[in-house]
A protein has these predicted regions:
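Acidic donor-binding segment of Leloir-type glycosyltransferases
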Residues: 25-67
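Short aromatic/hydrophobic "clamp" motif used to bind/position activated sugar donors
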Residues: 91
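Glycine-rich, basic loop-to-helix element that forms the pyrophosphate-binding segment
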Residues: 67-86
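Acidic donor-binding loop at a coil-to-helix junction in glycosyltransferase catalytic cores
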Residues: 173-180
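Conserved donor NDP-sugar-binding/catalytic core segment of glycosyltransferases
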Residues: 103-133
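Short, well-formed alpha-helical segments that are part of the catalytic scaffolds
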Residues: 14-29
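C-terminal catalytic/acceptor-binding lobe
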Residues: 181-364
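A recurrent flexible, glycine/aromatic-enriched loop bordering the glycosyltransferase active site
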Residues: 138-155
Length: 364
């Protein structure tokens, strides 16, 4: 293995100025023995094109695009894809919001040990401070991360390979960093929290937990995502789960695979009746093999008629319905629990009046 350190950036659809600020701070490192693997996990095509143009100016960056477009964000999967391309002994998991101290790489070489994995305290910048361009030491820090915040870590690559990478169950945000360090402890590798000085600054952004998930939006999400991640974290910890992934972890979706799924144009319309939705989730989806399913869920127009409302008021038996928000939450939760290793395409229409799922259930 090369005597360098690899830095992995997991990325999707973030502002270009964040990339510039972060990579510029790497360009001025006192120690140049590093390379960057920039994993674009399904950004919109116009954004990914702009990112690729921007990265041309940084000769230490390798750009990788995985066509996880129209799938929920998974930092774990994005990192694992990067791990599959890593050729160095040590790897640092970065964040597009991070500004590095100019001696950060030099510190990594001083700190790395064979069996130790190090995670770093971070200085948080305010929204206003994040908009300013300053020398690292001149930024005003509003707060510092606590030991429970383990997202920015240096790992011995072999340690991560020994536990099968990050747990790919985790989607959206939360728990994947705490989980990977917990499993490394099970494997006998000790973590170290480095808080002697601030070497990393975090540019402000709205937190995932503060985003609105109680109503349907075109941005993929569901109400119980954070709690679901916490439950999986506690399960892994309670049962000393060392390697939660199958052997195919870190799988990149190629452009050809993406095109094959999206070339399937024939869709079936399913109304939002409870019995229809539950039949799809309980019977159709788990019992369909070796084909692509393409379904669109829409509201039954009868649900909004005067006839339906009168019958409901009078207690006359009518169909029960799910809202599209409820269908969204049921679908996404089912996909992430039972079909996380399948390729699928999931969209909420721009008018919020339909939800579409294409999923490839072919084996291999």
């Amino acid at each position: 293995m090369e005597k360098m350190i690899t830095i992995i950036y997991p990325y999707r659809n973030r502002e270009l100025n964040r990339i510039t600020n972060s990579l510029n701070s790497l360009s001025t490192q006192s120690n140049k023995n590093f390379c960057v693997i920039f994993v674009d996990y399904g950004s919109d095509f116009d954004i990914s094109e702009s990112v690729q143009e921007l990265l041309i100016g940084y000769n230490f960056v390798e750009y990788i695009h995985s066509f996880h477009n129209n799938q929920p964000w998974s930092r774990s999967k994005a990192i694992n894809i990067g791990l599959r391309f890593t050729k160095t002994e040590y790897v640092f998991i970065a964040d597009i919001d991070i500004i590095f101290h100019h001696n950060f790489i030099a510190h990594l070489f001083e700190l790395k040990k064979e069996n130790d994995n190090i995670y770093f305290q971070v200085g948080y910048l305010s929204e206003d401070e994040s908009k300013k361009l300053k020398e690292f030491d001149n930024y005003n820090i509003t707060s510092k991360s606590i030991p429970e915040g383990k997202g920015l870590s240096l790992f011995n690559l072999n340690c991560l390979l020994a536990i099968g990478g990050f747990d790919e169950f985790f989607h959206f945000w939360g728990a994947e960093d705490e989980d990977v360090h917990s499993r490394l402890i099970i494997a006998g590798f000790s973590p170290i929290f480095y808080n002697h000085e601030i070497l990393l600054l975090h540019q402000w952004h709205q937190t995932f937990e503060s985003l609105e998930h109680q109503k349907l939006t075109i941005q993929l999400g569901f109400s119980d995502a954070f709690n679901l991640n916490k439950k999986k974290l506690r399960f892994n910890q309670s049962y000393n789960i060392l390697k939660p992934n199958n052997e195919n972890w870190g799988k990149l979706i190629s452009e050809d695979d993406f095109k094959i799924l999206n070339s399937h144009l024939d869709s079936i319309i399913l109304l939002n009746k409870k019995d229809v939705v539950e039949n799809f989730l309980d019977i159709v989806l788990p019992n369909t093999k070796d084909r692509i399913i393409n379904v669109v869920f829409k509201e039954d127009k009868y649900q909004s008629t005067l006839s339906y409302k009168i019958k409901s008021f009078l207690g006359i038996k009518v169909h029960d319905y799910y809202s599209l928000k409820q269908i969204n939450d049921l679908l996404l939760k089912t996909l992430l629990i039972y079909y996380k290793d399948s390729q699928f395409n999931y969209r909420v229409s721009s008018d919020l009046k339909s939800v579409q799922l294409k999923i490839n259930l072919c084996r291999g």
